[in-house]
Amino acid sequence: YGGAAGGGKSDALVIEALRQVHIPHYRGLILRKTYPQLSDLVDKSMAYYKRAFPTAQYNATSHVWAFPSGAKIYFGSMQYTKDRTNYQGKAFDFIGFDELTHFEWEEYSYMMSRNRPTGPGTRVYLRATTNPGGVGHGWVKARFITPAPPGTPIEEECTVQMPDGTE
């Protein structure tokens, strides 16, 4: 899945969101910059999700798949930076950005704060696909390409505030 357009990156992202749908409280989110761009991903999900889970249901109004376990995968967009508040107060075990370089750093970093467990037993993580170019090219390159050669794990430390207010 190198950087080539049409290389299957978006398909892999749509399929990756299925990894934890056996967990009833699992919530996944797949993002594109605009809803029209998102429609191709929804079409891919129709092909893959129905085949893997014949009784899963897609709600076209709310753009969400509901699985037999109770798990849900949402499809969303963030055309403007201010749209990030549509995700305020929400938690997603998995967040997938399709075409990450179309997003501003502020949008990506805000969504990282939404990437948190919805209950016990889920793996919380984020994935992204991208091609060169776009408004976010500079920050994506600075964050993921410049720091180290390919294949090098990049660890980031952060301070976490506990419920009692301590860090």
Model-derived segments and their meaning:
Residues 1-167:
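Phosphate/NTP-binding elements of NTP-utilizing enzymes
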